[in-house]
Each structure stands twice: as C-alpha cells, then as structure tokens.
C-alpha cells in the first residue's frame, strides 16, 4: 500500500481461484528463487481476487523470491482492469527475528539512491536532517529503492493537498515547502541520512559492495523492548523473577532421628534464631513420643571468633536469674564462691536463662549415679548436699556470687539488661587464645590460605 493511503489487495477469503495459466505451469526447483530477470522459470502465481475499490474481480500476483545476502520474501502485486486500481507490497516469508535491526545509511550519490530496500510493515523510516519520520504500521511493506521510499512519501503528502489549500491554506503551504525539501533530496542537493529501524529484524538495505564492508551503511542489532514485542504481537517475556532466598529465621525445619534414650524414631526441630546484640545460633530440640524424653541443644551459627571471650557476672539480685544465656559447647563455667568449675562440652550447647543453666548444673551433680546408693562415700555425699544448698541459695537470690563463662571460641553470650549501655555488674573480656586452647579447638593444624599447594601427596 502506498503512502497515499491506497487500499491493499483483497483478503485471502475473497480469492476466486488460480488462473488456467498458473495451473498449467507447475513449480519446479526451489520454492524461493533469487530475484533475477534472467530466470525464466521464476514466474508469479496469479490469483483472481476482489478489488476493494470497485468491488469487482481483479488479479493478485504473488512472487516468492530471495533477496541476495538477506532472506526470503513474498512480493504481492494487485491490479484491477475495471477501475485501474493497482497496489504492490511485500511480506516477510520468514519468522520474526530474535533481534531488531537498525540500518543507518549516509546517502551521498545517485548510486546510494538506487540501493535496493526491503521495508516491512513494522519498520520506522527517519530522515534526521528534515526531522521526518514514517511511523511503523502506517504503510504496507515494500520492495523498493531509497529513491522509491522518498517518492512514496511525497505521493502520500501530495494526496490531500488540493483539499488543504481550500480549507487550511497555511498548513498546505508548509506541507508544500516540506515536499520541496524531499524533492531536493531526490536531486541529491546535499547528503542526508536515512534510518530504517525494524523491531522484527526483517527489513533490509542493500550493500552494493557485498561481501566487502560498506562504509556508508551502519547495521545495528538490538534486543526488543517489551513495548516493541507487544507491537509485533509477541508475548513479552516476563522478566525473570529473582528466586527469593529462603528465610530460615521464620521457619522451623524438621528431620528424623533416633531418641538417645530408647532409640525409637523421633523428630528433631531446628530453627535459626538471631540473638539481640550478638549473632545467629541454631537451636535444635528433640521430643520422643515413645518414652517422653526431651532434649535441646544450641549450635553456633558462625565461625570461631578471632579472640576468646570471658564473661563475669556478679549476681546481686534475683532478677539476674532471668538473663538470657547462650552457652556453646566450647564454653566452661566457674562459680568461685563454690569452688566449682564445669568443663567444656559438659551439658553441650544451651540457650536458656541463668536460672535454667544453674538448675541443670544442680541436677547434673546431685543425680550422678556414682554419688547415690549405699556404696557412696558419706563425706562426698555431704559435700554434694552442701553444694546443692548453696547453689539453691544463689538461684533464690539469697547468696551473692560470681558467675564466669569462659569460651575460647568466643561464641557464648550473657544478656546485658542495660544494653546498649554497659552493665555495671557484668564484665566482658576479649583475650588471645593460648596454644593449648587452639589445640583443643583444632585450629593449630588448620591451613586457611594457600592450602591448594599442599593437596598433592608427597612421595
């Protein structure tokens, strides 16, 4: 369809049937042949179809051809012998390409004006020097030349000029002035730039120097925008949603295990918890439905700290028993007033209160099977009872004492009720570990840098 607003050929449903001449010459060889005047076998297919101008039957000719250094196209030409109406257009015979294409041609000579151009329906044509643009889908596709594109634009602008001159003389005068500029381009009054931008990737501008490089032509391939994909009738690909990172802080994980008491199948719950003003820890709790045994354990969620930690709390008030406490597996506990020390790994890791830990210590000591029964040492039993009583007094707030947590790994914690201010009754010390402490933590022989060089076995 031309720029003058000509009507396109009849719809496929309006076709009557192929002419006898077309039926008598069956196609041989490739379906799409290179466009050549010397190829006698390359004959168009003729179809009788409805003229949309006079509504009588005209003839549509279809030519399946291949543009050199480009791709296959279908050239369609319609003519009506009754009213004289004719129209020519092209359609791409291939699929929409993966990328859009933009041709930028600097026209300097008549040779450039004669370059072959394939312009599809979806292509936008621009001449920046004149601030002129032919929008996409405003014209049907065409197989023409650069000069033909300009002539087509001139015809479209001249179409309604007589009416404009009678109704809007000022606008018609400005359009006449612009038409004059387009005609000057045809006469090569000055060089200009022609830009053909096709999101479908199926437009083409000839390179007369092919396969050598064309210095006057710049070809740019680009990814279509969602708006361009929608314009072409393609389903715009939704942007890939970033997979949400699994937030374990708000989820309790469960896995099967065996009860440490009766060895029956049990379930262990595990949850990641953020301790305020400290770090993340992993709390695991096991509940056996068979024997009723319950246990919980805390694992550090981080690495071994560069320095060890010693926390000293002076217990002066019963409210101290409510302080949250994290005791890691590597933490030892001391109560100097009771001459008591609980070694590393005893009771395992725990996240509880100070009262809860002291009760666990009392239960651990008083229920020791070697201190009970007839065979127990009376002096030892008496000392344990005295220890239990004094520990009970500390729990009840009747006895002041110092509670010391010493963790070489630096992964234990005791709540500061005055946070973020300093606690006057609590002292936190950071210290450098000794060789023996590093040995217990397995750090002395650990190589964290340059370990790749020592992987090969030495012989």
UniProtKB/Swiss-Prot annotation:
Phenotype reported upon loss of the gene: Die during early embryonic development. Embryos show growth delay, failed to form normal trophectoderm and to expand the inner cell mass.
Keyword check for Metal-binding: yes
Entry's induction text: Up-regulated by high fat diet.
Main location: nucleus
Subcellular location: Nucleus; Cytoplasm; Nucleus, Nucleolus; Cytoplasm, Perinuclear region
Pfam families: jr-ZPR1, Zn_ribbon_ZPR1
Cross-referenced Gene3D superfamilies: ZPR1, A/B domain (2.60.120.1040), ZPR1, zinc finger domain (2.20.25.420)
Tissue: Expressed in brain. Expressed in the spinal cord motor neurons (at protein level). Expressed in spleen, liver, muscle, kidney and testis. Expressed in the frontal cortex, cornus ammonis, dentate gyrus of the hippocampus and in Purkinje cells of the cerebellum.
Positions annotated as zinc finger (C4-type): 51-83, 259-291
Region (Disordered): 1-43, 439-459
Keyword Transferase: no
Alphabetically ordered keywords of this record: Cell projection, Cytoplasm, Developmental protein, Differentiation, Metal-binding, mRNA processing, mRNA splicing, Nucleus, Repeat, Zinc, Zinc-finger
Molecular function GO labels: protein folding chaperone; receptor tyrosine kinase binding; translation initiation factor binding; zinc ion binding
GO biological process: apoptotic process involved in development; axon development; Cajal body organization; cellular response to epidermal growth factor stimulus; DNA endoreduplication; DNA replication; inner cell mass cell proliferation; microtubule cytoskeleton organization
Subunit structure as annotated in this protein's UniProt entry: Component of an import snRNP complex composed of KPNB1, SNUPN, SMN1 and ZNF259. Interacts (via C-terminal region) with SMN1 (via C-terminal region); the interaction occurs after treatment with serum. Interacts with elongation factor 1-alpha EEF1A1; the interaction occurs in a epidermal growth factor (EGF)-dependent manner. Interacts (via zinc fingers) with EGFR (via C-terminal cytoplasmic kinase domain); the interaction is negatively regulated in response to epidermal growth factor (EGF) stimulation and EGFR kinase activity. May also bind to the PDGFR receptor.
Similarity comment: Belongs to the ZPR1 family.
NCBIfam families: ZPR1_znf
Noted disease: May contribute to the severity of spinal muscular atrophy by increasing spinal motor neurons degeneration.
Function statement: Acts as a signaling molecule that communicates proliferative growth signals from the cytoplasm to the nucleus. It is involved in the positive regulation of cell cycle progression. Plays a role for the localization and accumulation of the survival motor neuron protein SMN1 in sub-nuclear bodies, including gems and Cajal bodies. Induces neuron differentiation and stimulates axonal growth and formation of growth cone in spinal cord motor neurons. Plays a role in the splicing of cellular pre-mRNAs. May be involved in H(2)O(2)-induced neuronal cell death.
Protein name, per record: Zinc finger protein ZPR1
Species of the source: Mus musculus
């Amino acid at each position: 369809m031309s720029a003058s607003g000509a009507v396109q050929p009849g719809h496929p449903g309006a076709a009557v049937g192929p002419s006898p001449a077309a039926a008598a010459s069956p196609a041989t060889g490739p379906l799409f042949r290179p466009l050549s005047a010397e190829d006698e076998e390359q004959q168009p297919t003729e179809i009788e179809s409805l003229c949309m101008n006079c509504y009588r039957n005209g003839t549509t000719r279809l030519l399946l051809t291949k543009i050199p250094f480009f791709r296959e196209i279908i050239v369609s030409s319609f003519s009506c012998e009754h009213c004289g109406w004719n129209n020519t257009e092209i359609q791409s015979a291939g699929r929409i390409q993966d990328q859009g294409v933009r041709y930028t041609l600097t026209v300097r000579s008549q040779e450039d004006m004669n370059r072959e151009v394939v312009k599809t329906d979806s292509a936008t044509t621009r001449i920046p020097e004149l601030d002129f643009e032919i929008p996409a889908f405003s014209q049907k596709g065409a197989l023409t030349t650069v000069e033909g594109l300009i002539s087509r634009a001139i015809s479209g602008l001249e179409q309604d000029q007589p009416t404009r001159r009678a109704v809007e003389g000022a606008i018609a005068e400005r359009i006449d002035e612009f038409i004059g500029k387009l005609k000057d381009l045809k006469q090569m009054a000055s060089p200009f730039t022609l830009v053909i931008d096709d999101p479908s990737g199926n437009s083409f501008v000839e390179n007369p120097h092919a396969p050598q490089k064309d210095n006057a032509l710049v070809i740019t391939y680009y990814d279509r925008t969602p708006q361009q994909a929608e314009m072409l009738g393609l389903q715009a690909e939704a942007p890939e949603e970033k997979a949400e990172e699994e937030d374990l802080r708000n989820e309790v994980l469960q896995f099967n295990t065996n009860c440490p008491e009766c060895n029956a199948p049990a379930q262990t719950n595990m949850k990641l918890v953020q301790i305020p003003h400290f770090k993340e820890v992993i709390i695991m709790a096991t509940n056996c439905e068979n024997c009723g045994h319950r246990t919980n354990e805390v694992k550090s969620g981080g690495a071994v700290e560069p320095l060890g930690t010693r926390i000293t709390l002076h217990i002066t008030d019963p409210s101290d028993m409510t302080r949250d406490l994290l005791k890691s597996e590597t933490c030892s506990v001391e109560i100097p007033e009771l001459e008591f020390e609980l070694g590393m790994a005893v009771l395992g890791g725990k996240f509880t209160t100070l009262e809860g830990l002291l009760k666990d210590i009392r239960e651990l000591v008083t229920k020791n099977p070697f201190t009970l029964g007839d065979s127990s040492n009376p002096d030892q039993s008496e000392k344990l009872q005295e220890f239990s009583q004094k520990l009970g007094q500390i729990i009840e707030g009747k006895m002041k004492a110092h509670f010391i947590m010493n963790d070489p790994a630096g992964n234990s914690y005791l709540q500061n009720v005055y946070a973020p201010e300093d606690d006057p009754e609590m002292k936190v010390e950071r210290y450098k570990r000794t060789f023996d402490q590093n040995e217990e933590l397995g750090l002395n022989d650990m190589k964290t840098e340059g370990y790749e060089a020592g992987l090969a076995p030495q012989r």
